UniProtKB/Swiss-Prot annotation:
Keyword Ligase: no
Listed SMART domains: COLFI
Species per Swiss-Prot/TrEMBL record: Gallus gallus (Chicken)
Its biological purpose: Type II collagen is specific for cartilaginous tissues. It is essential for the normal embryonic development of the skeleton, for linear growth and for the ability of cartilage to resist compressive forces.
Renumbered residue ranges of the record's region Disordered: 1-607
Residue spans of biased composition, Pro residues class: 279-292, 570-586
Subunit description: Homotrimers of alpha 1(II) chains.
Propeptide segments, given as residue ranges: 614-859
Positions bearing 4-hydroxyproline: P31, P40, P43, P46, P280, P286, P292, P553, P559, P574, P577, P580, P583, P586
PROSITE patterns linked: NC1_FIB
GO molecular function, one term: extracellular matrix structural constituent
Ranges of biased composition (kind: Basic and acidic residues): 136-147, 487-501
Disulfide cross-links: C655-C687, C695-C857, C765-C810
Lineage, top ranks: Eukaryota, Metazoa, Chordata, Craniata, Vertebrata
Gene: COL2A1
Protein name as annotated: Collagen alpha-1(II) chain
Length: 859
């Protein structure tokens, strides 16, 4: 039977002022079963006319549906372009409340919103700091459908919140991020007009709420731009005519809404706002609802299934980033209303949740305590269609869902009985604009016709004149979410609002520019003495002190490694052949253990040394004399290794070794091999047996006396003999027949085996000053010498780098030859020997010099 229309909903609180940008497209949910009658959506943009279908067979008349219970009025949607009347979709479940977003900057005045349902009275809370958006909580299962009840009472009006201190109008701030849709607040007293805010971004779509009664028809919107061409839906059966609603106030034009995807058409619902008349099509029986997308055959509508069992309640999750959808929890028991907590910090916008199935209407429960936001539940699979349940009692007002996107335009059908799908029709021509039609009477239900295939899409018809409000059709099934529509044009600037309240205190301004310098002040009194300043940088390095005296001799080092075995000595003279003896018994071989003690006379007597032929037990023959001579030669060689004699064949390591082994020997030339190894690279040196010094001769040992350098400049500077003077050379040491590389290696080992070095150089001069200048009394013209590690050794300065003079006979220009003997001693053996010399007082035609290079001695 035809139910009675529900009573009008109350005028809701003013909606949000800031039309936000179009949000991202949500995931497509599975189509749910047909829900109860939802609120009429905003008029959609006119779509192109679908292709006319073939005439279907009349279908059976359906039973009129029951009048749905009264629902709440939703938030006003963004103004879309006027279009043909779209099919009614089911009301979505209410979304979980989002956390408060940060206060947006002042923007232009938004359009008046529709009246929201009255909410529970909350305590006014303090302004909270902006926080992170919590994830969406699980949606509880809808309770079983109860018997139809009387319309519920109006909710109590909320307390008026405290008015903040009036502040100056702030500048337009940047556009804030859009937060998720929040819960419906209590209707407060009308506040002072707010500052104009920037358009905010729309929040994600919430779950569809239970269907409500028809609200007041909205004001007619201005003509919008034509929307995109939508797929044609099959027309539904015509319902009874509803009474037209009173004319609403004209709202401010909002931004153009995004285009939604076409949903499958449902049964004819109550009349919505009058849309623009679509182009007339051929009179065909309405086909069954088709699925969104490309045209195909519709399947038969399934039987409505029973409501599924409620799922278990999910635990509240910590507030954090949006996680994956959780399972649907059971609805909790309604608790007593608690006081509103202070607003939480602004959270980040959570991810858009999956659209769930609309549930059955539950009984009105007590308001529960606000729970923490849970994680979004997983998308449930669509249930099988169940039998229609008895009407339930009027439930409490649900949370206002966000405005749905406009559906695509459907084909206008002639008022006829529902038929089955006809065969696919050919594409029709574009229709002419139709005149304004009068409201048609409800058609008689026809017999069910066979389902025809979907006809081809026709050309878009011309826009018809505004028709009167059509009869209300039953609620259609919720369509699939449409693709993201293009962003609408920005609405016109609204009228200036009244002066706002005083704002919060502004932030401290930036540092001002420095002012002009003031006049100079009077001289102040002398201040107290300041603290001592930081320590200054270190001063330049002072001249080096004199060399310290030689330290005490160190302890005797560990014994060196055992020496190499000596070369075999010369074979002794052959002995006289003895008479042949009688053949003896087989011998047993020589006991080689006798060789083990060779040379170790300190550990016992030499067995060979005290063995005589007459002591042999008959095993030794006459040729044992040769063995004895060989053993003596080996013994002598071992002794020579242990006590080197300094010969070329048996060189010592240093002269100090020769002095230790042979303290009675005299000074003279000996052979040494500091790097050991093969004796072929031994060098001949002079050994001072008084001190144990090893002195290596230079090659050559002198620089001829002549005029080596001629310079026309009066500025005197040091001239290095080897580097600068033509024909000069670095001083080298060792035997002439040894390669310089071999001598250099032996000198390196000799320096490592020594603790001190010394060398003399004699400078022969003719009209050239070598050390002291008798005329000036200073050493500015003294010669420089260079050590083997490239260090320069001077006449004055750091004592570690200065030489001494044993004799100075080159102090003035006499025209005669003189000489100056220079000596340098150092415990830094790497500085010796001397490799170059640099006189300064040369360059004149009468200035000559020569050098005698003494041996370098290491101790």
């Amino acid at each position: 039977l035809q139910g009675l229309p529900g009573k009008d909903g109350e005028t809701g609180a003013a909606g949000p002022l800031d039309p936000g940008p179009v949000g991202e497209r949500g995931e497509q949910g599975a189509p749910g079963p047909s829900g109860f009658q939802g609120l009429p959506g905003p008029p959609g943009p006119p779509g192109e006319s679908g292709k006319p279908g073939d005439q279907g067979v009349p279908g059976e008349a359906g039973a009129p549906g029951l009048v749905g219970p009264r629902g709440e009025r939703g938030f006003p949607g963004e103004r879309g372009s006027p279009g043909a009347q779209g099919l009614q979709g089911p009301r979505g479940l209410p979304g979980t409340p989002g956390t408060d977003g940060p206060k947006g900057a002042t923007g232009p005045a938004g359009p008046n919103g529709a009246q929201g349902p009255p909410g529970l009275q909350g305590m006014p809370g303090e302004r909270g700091a902006a926080g992170i958006a919590g994830p969406k909580g699980d949606r509880g299962d809808v309770g079983e459908k109860g018997p139809e009840g009387a319309p519920g009472k109006d909710g109590a009006r909320g307390l008026t919140g405290p008015i903040g201190p009036p502040g100056p109008a702030g500048p337009n701030g940047e556009k804030g991020e859009s937060g998720p849709p929040g819960p419906s607040g209590a209707a407060g007293a009308r506040g002072a007009p707010g500052e104009r805010g920037e358009p905010g971004a729309p929040g994600p779509a919430g779950f569809a709420g239970p269907p409500g009664a028809d609200g007041q028809p909205g004001a007619k919107g201005e003509q919008g731009e034509p929307g995109q061409k939508g797929d044609a839906g099959a027309p539904g059966p015509q319902g009874p005519s509803g009474a037209p609603g009173p004319q609403g106030p004209t709202g401010v034009t909002g931004p153009k809404g995004a285009r939604g995807a076409q949903g499958p058409p449902g049964a004819t619902g109550f009349p919505g706002a009058a849309g623009r008349v679509g182009p007339p099509g051929p009179n065909g029986n309405p086909g069954p609802p088709g699925p969104p997308g490309s045209a195909g055959k519709d399947g038969p509508k399934g039987v409505r299934g029973d409501a599924g069992p409620p799922g278990r309640a999910g635990d509240p999750g910590l507030q954090g980033p949006a996680g994956p959808p959780g399972e649907k929890g059971e609805p909790g028991e309604d608790g007593p209303a608690g006081p509103d907590g202070p607003p939480g910090p602004q959270g980040l916008a959570g991810q858009r949740g999956i659209v769930g199935l609309p549930g059955q209407r539950g009984e009105r429960g007590f308001p529960g305590l606000p729970g923490p936001s849970g994680e979004p539940g997983k998308q449930g699979a669509p249930g099988s269609a169940g039998d229609r349940g008895p009407p339930g009692p009027v439930g409490p007002p649900g949370l206002t869902g966000p405005a749905g996107e406009p559906g695509r335009e459907g084909n206008p059908g002639a008022d006829g009985p529902p038929g089955r799908d006809g065969a696919a029709g050919v594409k029709g021509d574009r229709g002419e604009t139709g005149p304004v039609g009068a409201p048609g009477a409800p058609g008689a239900p026809g017999a069910p016709g066979p389902v025809g295939p979907t006809g081809k899409q026709g050309d878009r018809g011309e826009t018809g004149a505004q028709g009167p409000m059509g009869p209300s059709g039953p609620a259609g099934a919720r369509g699939m979410p449409g693709p993201q529509g293009p962003r609408g044009d920005k609405g016109e600037t609204g009228e200036a609002g009244e002066r706002g309240l005083k704002g919060h205190r502004g932030f401290t301004g930036l540092q001002g520019l420095p002012g002009p310098p003031g006049p100079s002040g009077d001289q102040g009194a002398a201040g107290p003495a300041g603290p001592s300043g930081p320590r200054g940088p270190p001063g330049p390095v002072g001249p080096s002190g004199k060399d310290g005296s030689n330290g005490m001799p160190g302890p005797i080092g560990p014994p060196g490694p055992r020496g190499r075995s000596g070369e075999p000595g010369p074979a002794g003279p052959p002995g006289n052949p003895g008479p042949p003896g009688p053949p003896g018994p087989p011998g047993t071989g020589i006991d080689m253990s006798a060789f083990a003690g060779l040379g170790q006379t300190e550990k016992g007597p030499d067995p060979i040394r005290y063995m005589r032929a007459d002591e042999a037990a008959g095993g030794l023959r006459q040729h044992d004399v040769e063995v004895d001579a060989t053993l003596k030669s080996l013994n002598n060689q071992i002794e020579s290794i242990r006590s080197p004699e300094g010969s070329k064949k048996n060189p010592a390591r240093t002269c100090r070794d020769i002095k230790l082994c042979h303290p009675e020997w005299k000074s003279g030339d000996y052979w040494i091999d500091p790097n050991q190894g093969c004796t072929l690279d031994a060098i001949k040196v002079f050994c001072n047996m008084e001190t144990g010094e090893t002195c290596v001769y230079p090659t050559p040992s002198s620089i001829p006396r002549k005029n080596w350098w001629t310079s026309k400049t009066k500025d005197k500077k040091h001239v290095w003999f080897a580097e600068t003077i033509n024909g000069g050379f670095h001083f080298s040491y060792g035997d002439e027949n040894l390669s310089p590389n071999t001598a250099s290696i032996q000198m390196t080992f000799l320096r490592l085996l020594s603790t001190e070095g010394s060398q003399n150089v004699t400078y022969h001069c003719k009209n050239s000053i070598a050390y002291m200048d008798e005329e000036t009394g200073n050493l500015k013209k003294a010669i420089l010498i260079q050590g083997s590690n490239d260090v320069e050794i001077r006449a004055e300065g750091n004592s570690r780098f200065t030489y001494s003079v044993l004799e100075d006979g080159c102090t003035k220009h006499t025209g005669k030859w003189g000489k100056t003997v220079i000596e340098y001693r150092s415990q830094k053996t790497s500085r010796l020997p001397i490799v170059d010399i640099a006189p300064m007082d040369i360059g004149g035609a009468d200035q000559e010099f020569g050098v005698d290079i003494g041996p370098v001695c290491f101790l």
